[in-house]
Structures are given as structure tokens and as C-alpha cells.
Amino acid sequence: MKNTVLAAFSGILLATTAVVYAGDKGQEIYDSKCKVCHETGAAGAPKMGDKDAWAPRIAAGTDSLMNSVINGKNAMPPKGTCMDCSDDDLKAAMEYMTSKSQ
């Protein structure tokens, strides 16, 4: 019984740590790469936190957003200049931004 409880607790702890890490990674990438445009709306970028600007993008779905992030869109270059970011890194940044814009 103790082993079962310990295993369950360990699993929950690991899952929680992974979620926190993903959020931190998303914010880290946003702060270092995305913020320069998405905080001010430079070059037509939707400002983070602008629910009206983000609503149609969020409604289009994660695949559509990731396509824009990876390939670029309008004035946004591919990967938003984060050429060393993996797709998972970019997804973490996108999720961070959309979570603050709903």
C-alpha cells in the first residue's frame, strides 16, 4: 500500500514539475524573443493580452497557430527569430502567450 501511494504521489509530482517547467520555458522564450513585437504590437503583431486580437487566432486552433509560428506570417519571420528553438519550445511560447490572451 505504501509503495502504491508513494508511486502515485511521485507521478503527480513529476507531472506538476513538467507543467511548471513548460510554463517557465514559454515565458523565457517570450521574454527573450517574442516580447519585442508582441508587447508593443510592432509590425502588426497581436499584443499579448489583447483578447480581441487573439480570439480569432485561438479559435483557428493550435495547428494553425503553430503553422504561423514555425513558418512565419506577415511581418513575423519563421520561428519568430528563435532559430535555435525546437517545435516544443515554440509551442511552449505560443501556449504562454495564448494563456495570457484569453
Regions found by a protein language model. Give the residues of each.
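Bacterial N-terminal signal peptides
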Residues: 8-16
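Axial heme c-ligation environment in periplasmic c-type cytochrome domains
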Residues: 46-47, 55, 67-92, 96-101
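Sec/Tat signal peptide C-region and signal peptidase I cleavage site
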Residues: 17-23
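Gly/Gly-Pro-rich "capping" loops immediately C-terminal to redox-active cysteine motifs
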Residues: 39-67
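Local sequence-structure signature of Cys/Sec-based thiol-disulfide redox active-site neighborhoods
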Residues: 23-33, 43
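Bacterial N-terminal signal peptides that target proteins for export
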Residues: 1-8
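The canonical Cys-X-X-Cys-His
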Residues: 33-40, 93, 97
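Processing junctions and N-termini across compartments
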Residues: 16, 28-31, 79
